[in-house]
Curated annotation (Swiss-Prot):
It comes from Rhizorhabdus wittichii (strain DSM 6014 / CCUG 31198 / JCM 15750 / NBRC 105917 / EY 4224 / RW1) (Sphingomonas wittichii). This is Phosphate acyltransferase. It is found in: Cytoplasm. It holds the Pfam family FA_synthesis. Pathway: Lipid metabolism; phospholipid metabolism. Catalyzes the reversible formation of acyl-phosphate (acyl-PO(4)) from acyl-[acyl-carrier-protein] (acyl-ACP). This enzyme utilizes acyl-ACP as fatty acyl donor, but not acyl-CoA. Gene3D superfamilies: Isopropylmalate Dehydrogenase.
Amino acid sequence: MDEAPRIAIDAMGGDGGPATIIAGAAQARDRDSSLRLTFTGDETVIRAEMARFPQLADSIVVHCDDVITGDDKPSQAIRRTKSSSMGAAILAVKAGEAAAALSAGNTGALMAIAKLSLRTMHGIDRPALAALMPTLGDNDLVMLDLGANTDCDARNLVEFAVMGAAYSRLALGIESPRVRLLNIGTEELKGTGELKEAAAMLRQQTGGAWRFDGFIEADRLGRGEADVIVSDGFSGNIALKSIEGTARFITDLLRRAFSSSLRSKAGFILSRPAFALLRHHLDPNNHNGAVFLGLNGLVVKSHGGADEKGIANAIAVAAKIAREDLTRRITDDLEDFRSHAVQTEGVA
């Protein structure tokens, strides 16, 4: 993409509302002055927030009367696609007026509106929600699905694997990502029928720019033993929330321990650099920006509780996948995988 991408941002979504979204967008613009931004939502509120940030003066504002809340069901959100700030951001992508859409709002509503408006790519049954997660290895990992689909069959999981590998190569620069399926054990006989069937299909893969390394258990997620971890959305969302909750627990536990006595406080001063590094790795704002894979258009989901830095990071994710044409990469990889699958069946 020669021209800097335009990102359509739902300014009304998220816990912090327009103040956090606009401030985060200003941070993103400070990092990358070539970014072009469109904000959707209450124009009066948005422009009042934009007035604090001269770097956003050339941004476009699309007025919307309606806001999708966390209490809205997907079916309700769909009916308000044209009138809502969330829907307007996605429709901008559909119309070619933006390269990607971003929202920190209701995940289920965002998924429903995006799928209905943009449709899934040819041959893809369901889109998946993918995000980067920190590890103890040299690179982060891509994990999907994180909640878009609670019930998946083997074909869905295989498609997730191919799409996740494409995203891993783009986001992390890994030439041949290691793909593994999240399971209750690493043995081939462990797991549901869908998992075992998906594993069998992935083992037959004879080409392509990734490799299947079998199953992985939840306690090994952050060990750097995989580049892409695939699961259904139910298990993936539980794993994600468990990781986030554990990170907050550890942070709070350390804070309490370091403030328990004068000796502990002195210890904190000495270990502050290490503690700062730990907080950096555990802070979800540093990995904010999950991507819906498998749609005919790019949509990024920000964590609802993200701060300004988190919003800026999510915008950076949207800009990167737009610049490097993630949709085309996924299409090419799916075609490559299917051609190898046909060749394998022919040999068999």
